Swiss-Prot record, chain A:
Signal peptide: none annotated. GO terms for cellular component: cytosol. Its EC number is 4.2.1.20. The keyword Lyase applies. The alpha subunit is responsible for the aldol cleavage of indoleglycerol phosphate to indole and glyceraldehyde 3-phosphate. Pfam families: Trp_syntA. It comes from Halobacterium salinarum (strain ATCC 700922 / JCM 11081 / NRC-1) (Halobacterium halobium). The lineage of its organism: Archaea, Methanobacteriati, Methanobacteriota, Stenosarchaea group, Halobacteria. This is Tryptophan synthase alpha chain. It is an enzyme of class 4 (lyase).
Swiss-Prot record, chain B:
The keyword Cell inner membrane does not apply. The modification N6-(pyridoxal phosphate)lysine is found at residue 95. Pathway: Amino-acid biosynthesis; L-tryptophan biosynthesis; L-tryptophan from chorismate: step 5/5. It comes from Halobacterium salinarum (strain ATCC 700922 / JCM 11081 / NRC-1) (Halobacterium halobium). One of its GO terms (cellular component) is cytoplasm. Its EC number is 4.2.1.20. NCBIfam families: trpB. The lineage of its organism: Archaea, Methanobacteriati, Methanobacteriota, Stenosarchaea group, Halobacteria. This is Tryptophan synthase beta chain. It catalyses: (1S,2R)-1-C-(indol-3-yl)glycerol 3-phosphate + L-serine = D-glyceraldehyde 3-phosphate + L-tryptophan + H2O. Tetramer of two alpha and two beta chains.
Length: 276, 430
C-alpha cells in the first residue's frame, strides 16, 4: 500500500494538526482561517462538520458547532468549502456518524465518503464510531483510498489498542486525557504512558485533547509523539473574534501566530530534525 | 418475531439493524465492563444479585403493583379495561424499577459514584431515591428549561441529597442532559456508573433496562391469569424513550430475562397485541428549516439513524441533524426511541401509533373523573389510544406513572386548548 497524504504529513518532523469547525462563523471566514493556519505551519487540517449532538466535545467546540449550524452549515456546504481550499495540506473530516449515515441515500456512510473523496478529503475521524462499529465506514474509505483514524483513549485496554492499530490508517489519534475536548494549561500525566504503550507501532502518533500552547506541544513531542492536535485553543480565538466583532482577517492573523507558536513548540520537543 | 427469544441468549446488542455501541472510545472499556456485569449479575444471577433486586423492589418499592379493573372506561370502550398500576410504585412512576436495579448493579460492580440524566425529573428522582437508599453519591444532569418547569422534582432530588446540575447548552431539555451526562461519564469513567433512564443508549443499556422494567409485564401476566383467567388480548403503553413500553411488553415479546420469574411468565405470547403510543404533539412531521418537530413520534414517523449510542428511529432533518421534539408530556419529549422497539415495529410485533396533546389531555381528565386515578400525562396518551383499539378482548393499559407532577401543566394547557373534559377552575382564579 502506498503511503497516504495523511501519513506523509508526519514525515518531516513533528506535525501540527489544526482543527476548526467549518462555517464558524461563516464558510468564507473558515476558508481564510485555514489559509492562515497553514501559513503558520499546520501540516494537517482537521475540519469539523458540525453535528447537533457533539457528545465528545467540551463547551468551546459545542458553542462553535452551534454558531456554525445557526449560520446554516450543511454537509453539502462543507464539501463545497473543502473543494475550495487551496492550501496544499491534507484535510481530515471530523464529524459524528449520523451525518455520514444520512448523506445521499440515507443508508450508510458510502455516499458521503464518495462525495468527500471527490471534494478532496483525505480521511476521517469519527468520535462516536468505535472500532467495533466501524466496518461500513472502513470499507467505504478503503474503496476510495481514504484514511480512517481511530482514537486511542487513556482508558483503552491493550486488546482494543491492538485492534485499532491494526485498522487505523494515516495516523493514530492519541486522546491525551479522559473527558471531552477543551483547552487546558497542562499536559495530562496520562500522555507519556499512552505514548509508551504505542511505542511498538510505526504509525504516526498525534496527541490531542487539551493542547493549547507551544510549551505543551514541546512536552508532548518530547514524550515521543509524532504530532500534536490542537482544536479548542483555535476555536477560543475564533469565539473571541466573534464576541468582539473582529474582522476575519484579524482573527486569521491571531490563528497564524498561534499555529506558529505550536509548531515551533512541537519542533523544540525533538532534539534534531527527524527523517523517517 | 424477536431475535432474542431464548432467555439464555447472549445478545451482541443488536436488534435487527438497530442497537449497537456508538460511543466514544474513552467509554468503550466501561461499556464492555458493564456488558460483562450485566451478563453475570442480571442474566446469571451471580452472587444472588437478582434475588437481592427482587427483594428490594418489593420491600422498598412496594411491588407488586395491582392490576385494577376500570369499570367506567370498560363501559365507554365496550371491552374490559384493566390498569397496571405503576403509578403506585414508590416515587409515583415505573422509573424506580430501572433506577434501583442499576444503582444496585453499580454497587455490585464496586462503582462509587452515580450520574444520571433526567428530562421531566422522574428518572432523576427515582435515581436519587435509590442512591439515598443504597448510600451512593449521585449527580443528576437536567436541562435548564426542565429545571425551571419541574421545580418540585428538583427539590425532591435535593432532598435525597443528589446534586442537580442544570445544563444550559441548546434547548436545555432531555437530549442535552443526556449529552452532558455522557460527557461526565467520559471524564469520570473509572469510578462512575451512568444510570441511563430508558431503553436507549449503547448495549447493554437497552437490554438491561428492559429486563429490570420487565418485572411489570411478568407481574401483569401472572395477575391476568389470576384475575381474568387468561392473557389480555392487548397491552397498551405510552412510548417516549420506551422504558415503560418495554417493561409492559417485554415478557410478552419474550426477549426480557430476569431470573426468578414465575414459570411461563417470560415465554413469547404472540397472540397478545402490543400497542405503543407516542406523543403526536400539536401535529406530526418535522420542520427541516427550524430543526423542530412539533411532536415526539420517532417510532411511528421517524427515520433510521444513530443517536446517543444506538442505531434507531429518530426525528431528524434530511441531513441528519437531530431536531428538538415536543409534547405536552415532558416524559415523552425525546427525538429518539429504544432500538428494540424500532426493531419490533419493523417486524410487526408492536403496533406504533400516536395521540396528540389535546386527546391526551382529555384522557387525563376522563381517567381522573371516571376512575379516581390521576394519570401522568405520558400515561394519558396510552389511555387516549383506547379509542383506536378495535379488538373485543380485555385490554391492559400500563399506567406508567401518576399525574400529580403534571397538574400545573394540565390546568394551563386545558384552558389554553379548550379541553371539554376539563373541570371548571375559573372560580378559583384570583
Amino acid at each position: 500500500m502506498t503511503r497516504s497524504d495523511l501519513a506523509a504529513a508526519f514525515d518531516d518532523g513533528p506535525a501540527l494538526v489544526s482543527y476548526v469547525v467549518a462555517g464558524d462563523p461563516t464558510p468564507a471566514a473558515t476558508a481564510e482561517y485555514i489559509d492562515a493556519l497553514v501559513d503558520g505551519g499546520t501540516d494537517v487540517i482537521e475540519l469539523g462538520l458540525p453535528f447537533s449532538e457533539p457528545v465528545a466535545e467540551g463547551t468551546t467546540i459545542q458553542n462553535a458547532i452551534k454558531r456554525a449550524l445557526d449560520a446554516g452549515m450543511t454537509p453539502d456546504a462543507y464539501l463545497d468549502l473543502v473543494a475550495r481550499i487551496d492550501a496544499d495540506v491534507p484535510v481530515v473530516c471530523m464529524t459524528y456518524y449520523n451525518l455520514l449515515f444520512q448523506y445521499g441515500d440515507r443508508a450508510g456512510p458510502a455516499a458521503f465518503v464518495s462525495a468527500a473523496a471527490e471534494a478532496g478529503v483525505s480521511g476521517f475521524v469519527v468520535p462516536d464510531l468505535p472500532v467495533d462499529e466501524s466496518g461500513p465506514l472502513r470499507e467505504a474509505c478503503r474503496a476510495h483510498g481514504l484514511d480512517l483514524v481511530f482514537v486511542v483513549a487513556p482508558t483503552t485496554t491493550a486488546d482494543r489498542r491492538e485492534r485499532m492499530l491494526d485498522l487505523t490508517t494515516g495516523f493514530v489519534y492519541v486522546q491525551g486525557r479522559v473527558g471531552t475536548t477543551g483547552a487546558r494549561e497542562e499536559v495530562s500525566a496520562a500522555t507519556p504512558d499512552a505514548l509508551a504503550a504505542l511505542q511498538h507501532t510505526d504509525i504516526p502518533k498525534a496527541v490531542g485533547f487539551g493542547v493549547s500552547s507551544g510549551e505543551q506541544a514541546r512536552e508532548i513531542t518530547a514524550s515521543g509523539a509524532d504530532g500534536v492536535i490542537v482544536g479548542s485553543a483555535y476555536v477560543d480565538t475564533v469565539a473571541d473574534g466573534v464576541a468582539d466583532d473582529d474582522p476575519p482577517s484579524v482573527v486569521a492573523d491571531r490563528l497564524r501566530d498561534l499555529a506558529a507558536e505550536l509548531k515551533a513548540g512541537a519542533a523544540r520537543g525533538v532534539p534534531e530534525p527527524e527523517h523517517k | 418475531m424477536s431475535t432474542n427469544t431464548d432467555d439464555t441468549t447472549r445478545t451482541d446488542g443488536t436488534f435487527g439493524d438497530y442497537g449497537g455501541q456508538y460511543v466514544p472510545e474513552v467509554l468503550m472499556p466501561a461499556v464492555e465492563e458493564l456488558t460483562d456485569a450485566y451478563e453475570r449479575y442480571v442474566l446469571d444471577n451471580e452472587d444472588g444479585f437478582v434475588d437481592d433486586f427482587r427483594q428490594r423492589i418489593r420491600s422498598f418499592g412496594g411491588r407488586p403493583t395491582p392490576l385494577t379493573h376500570a369499570p367506567t372506561l370498560s363501559q365507554r370502550h365496550g371491552v374490559d379495561v384493566y390498569l397496571k398500576r405503576e403509578d403506585l410504585l414508590h416515587g409515583g412512576a415505573h422509573k424506580l424499577n430501572n433506577a434501583l436495579g442499576q444503582v444496585l448493579l453499580a454497587k455490585y460492580m464496586g462503582k462509587d459514584r452515580i450520574v444520571a440524566e433526567t428530562g421531566a425529573g422522574q428518572h432523576g428522582t427515582a435515581t436519587a431515591m435509590a442512591c439515598a437508599a443504597l448510600e451512593m453519591p449521585c449527580e443528576i444532569y437536567m436541562g435548564r428549561t426542565d429545571v425551571n418547569r419541574q421545580r418540585p422534582n428538583v427539590f425532591r432530588m435535593r432532598l435525597h441529597d443528589a446534586d442537580v446540575n442544570p445544563v444550559t447548552v441548546g434547548s436545555g431539555t432531555l437530549k442535552e442532559a443526556i449529552n452532558e451526562t455522557m460527557r461526565d461519564w467520559a471524564t469520570n469513567v473509572a469510578d462512575t456508573h451512568y444510570v441511563i433512564g430508558s431503553v436507549v443508549g449503547p448495549h447493554p443499556f437497552p437490554s438491561m433496562v428492559r429486563d429490570f422494567q420487565a418485572i411489570i409485564s411478568e407481574e401483569l401476566r401472572a395477575q391476568s391469569r389470576e384475575q381474568l383467567g387468561e392473557l389480555p388480548a392487548a397491552v397498551i403503553a405510552c412510548a417516549g424513550g420506551g422504558s415503560n413500553t418495554m417493561g409492559a411488553f417485554g415478557a410478552f415479546v419474550g426477549s426480557a430475562s430476569l431470573p426468578g420469574a414465575p414459570a411461563g411468565t417470560h415465554e413469547p405470547a404472540p397472540d397478545v397485541d402490543l400497542l405503543a403510543v407516542e406523543a403526536g404533539g400539536s401535529r406530526l412531521g418535522v420542520d427541516d428549516d427550524a430543526g423542530y418537530a412539533p411532536n415526539s413520534a420517532s417510532l411511528s414517523t421517524g427515520t433510521e439513524g444513530v443517536l446517543h449510542g444506538a442505531r434507531t428511529k429518530l426525528l431528524q432533518t434530511e441531513t441528519g441533524q437531530i431536531v428538538e421534539s415536543h409534547s405536552v408530556s415532558a416524559g415523552l419529549d425525546y427525538a429518539g426511541v429504544g432500538p428494540e422497539l424500532a426493531h419490533l415495529v419493523d417486524t410487526g410485533r408492536i403496533t406504533p401509533t400516536n395521540v396528540d396533546d389535546d386527546a391526551a389531555l382529555a384522557a387525563f381528565h376522563r381517567l381522573s373523573r371516571d376512575e379516581g386515578v390521576i394519570p401522568a400525562l405520558e400515561t394519558s396518551h396510552a389511555v387516549a389510544a383506547l379509542d383506536q383499539y378495535d379488538g373485543d378482548g380485555p385490554v391492559v393499559v400500563n399506567v406508567s406513572g401518576r399525574g400529580d407532577k403534571d397538574l400545573d401543566t394540565v390546568i394551563e394547557a386545558s384552558a389554553a386548548n379548550d379541553i371539554d373534559a376539563a373541570p371548571d377552575m375559573e372560580v378559583f382564579e384570583q
